[in-house]
């Protein structure tokens, strides 16, 4: 599995994320994507030094802007049969990826998507107004696309590589998460959702 980890400057969170993910017993590679303009030189040097500890890590400068641009270059450079998309700032819980991989191994042609709305404990320090706005937006998306999932915009997923093969992300800001869910859906890929917890980042 190719694990894509975009980063700006949240280096301590990235280190913790890698430490947790590296314990998962699966053939994996880490693809760390950092910003040519926004990542500090000191952080870039630390990312490069991580290669000494993690031989299965490669780091790339993103070419197109925003998080969608980072994810896009990660997908292009992924070498494994499956692709995991997550954050390096701990807003996506790295402990949850092990279970997502287990489910993926039993459902080879499905997308495994983390879902904050399955349980009542999916949000931590999200803010009431933001919470309600997200709730309404997800409901509208569910009605519009007539699909059973509850969380269309949480970019914490595992994809079969062929679900994204040849696809270039068009919406580079936050809309990329919805875009790269809908594109495989149109190809007929099934989506399996698992409960996930979101926690506000403290870095980055």
Q: Where do the language-model regions lie?
A:
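Cell-envelope/extracellular polymer assembly enzymes that use nucleotide-activated donors
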Residues: 1-2, 29
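A conserved acidic beta->alpha catalytic loop
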Residues: 34-44, 90
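Catalytic donor-sugar/metal-binding loop of nucleotide-sugar-dependent glycosyltransferases
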Residues: 147-148, 169-172, 181-199
């Amino acid at each position: 599995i190719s694990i894509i980890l975009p980063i700006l400057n949240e280096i301590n969170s990235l280190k913790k994320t890698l430490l947790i993910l590296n314990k998962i017993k699966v053939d994996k590679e880490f693809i760390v994507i950092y910003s040519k303009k926004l990542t500090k030189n000191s952080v870039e040097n630390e990312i490069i030094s991580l290669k000494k500890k993690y031989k299965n890590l490669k780091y790339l400068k993103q070419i197109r802007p925003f998080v969608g641009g980072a994810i896009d270059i990660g997908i292009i450079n992924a070498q494994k049969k499956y692709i995991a998309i997550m954050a390096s700032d701990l807003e996506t819980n790295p402990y949850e990826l092990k279970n997502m991989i287990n489910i993926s191994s039993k459902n080879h042609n499905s997308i495994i998507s983390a879902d904050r709305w399955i349980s009542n404990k999916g949000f931590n320090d999200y803010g009431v107004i933001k919470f309600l706005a997200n709730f309404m937006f997800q409901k509208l998306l569910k009605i519009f696309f007539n699909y059973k999932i509850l969380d269309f915009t949480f970019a914490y997923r595992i994809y079969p590589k062929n679900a994204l093969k040849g696809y270039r992300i068009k919406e580079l800001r936050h809309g990329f998460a919805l875009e790269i869910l809908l594109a495989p859906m149109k190809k007929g890929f099934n989506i399996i959702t698992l409960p996930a917890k979101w926690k506000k980042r403290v870095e980055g």
